């Protein structure tokens, strides 16, 4: 009788513990988050186009692979960027990675908070961790970028 009670309670405990664990498919992508309304480059940068300005940053997937970001090198406002060309770099405890611009245009603003707090790229890649704001010189370049469904 005692053995049956022990077996029953063990089986129940196993059922409960496996029911609360999330299931991850080995075929699923490991992107932490992909947001609708943004455009994505194959090189893992994102663009949010609002009016005449496009905000650019690196994706959650990119920051996750880099690890803890410790330094960000960005250009100055007033300069220009060219699609598929590097405009800055992100240094982490693991590696340094160039950041490519997904669009061409004039840099109208740089996120100065990143010089003091580069970890914003890790904690908030789509909000506080944005890198530059660009006035696109060729807005049709946005059409060649991926939406959220294509990126995942």
UniProtKB/Swiss-Prot annotation:
Principal location class: mitochondrion
Free-text comment on the cofactor: Binds 1 lipoyl cofactor covalently.
Residues recorded as bearing N6-lipoyllysine in the entry: 94
UniProt xrefs under Gene3D superfamilies: 2.40.50.100
Record GO biological process: glycine decarboxylation via glycine cleavage system
Domain Lipoyl-binding as annotated: residue spans: 53-135
Coiled coil: none
Cofactor: (R)-lipoate
Residue interval of the organelle targeting sequence: 1-31
Compartments in which it is found: Mitochondrion
GO cellular component: glycine cleavage complex; mitochondrion
UniProtKB keywords: Lipoyl, Mitochondrion, Transit peptide
NCBIfam families in UniProt: gcvH (TIGR00527), PRK01202.1 (NF002270)
Family classification: Belongs to the GcvH family.
Subunit structure: The glycine cleavage system is composed of four proteins: P, T, L and H.
Function of the protein: The glycine cleavage system catalyzes the degradation of glycine. The H protein shuttles the methylamine group of glycine from the P protein to the T protein.
Protein name per its UniProtKB record: Glycine cleavage system H protein, mitochondrial
């Amino acid at each position: 009788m005692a053995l049956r009670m022990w077996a029953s309670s063990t089986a129940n405990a196993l059922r409960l513990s496996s029911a609360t664990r999330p299931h991850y498919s080995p075929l699923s992508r490991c992107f932490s988050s992909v947001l609708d309304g943004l455009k994505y480059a194959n090189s893992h940068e994102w663009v949010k186009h609002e009016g005449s300005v496009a905000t650019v940053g690196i994706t959650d997937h990119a920051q996750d692979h880099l690890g803890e970001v410790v330094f960000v090198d960005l250009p100055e406002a007033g300069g220009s960027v060219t699609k598929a060309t590097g405009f800055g770099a992100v240094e982490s405890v693991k590696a340094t990675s160039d950041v490519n611009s997904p669009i061409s245009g004039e840099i109208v603003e740089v996120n100065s908070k990143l010089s003091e707090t580069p970890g914003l790229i890790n904690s908030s890649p789509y909000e506080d961790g944005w890198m530059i704001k660009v006035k696109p010189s060729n807005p049709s370049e946005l059409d060649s970028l991926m939406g959220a469904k294509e990126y995942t």
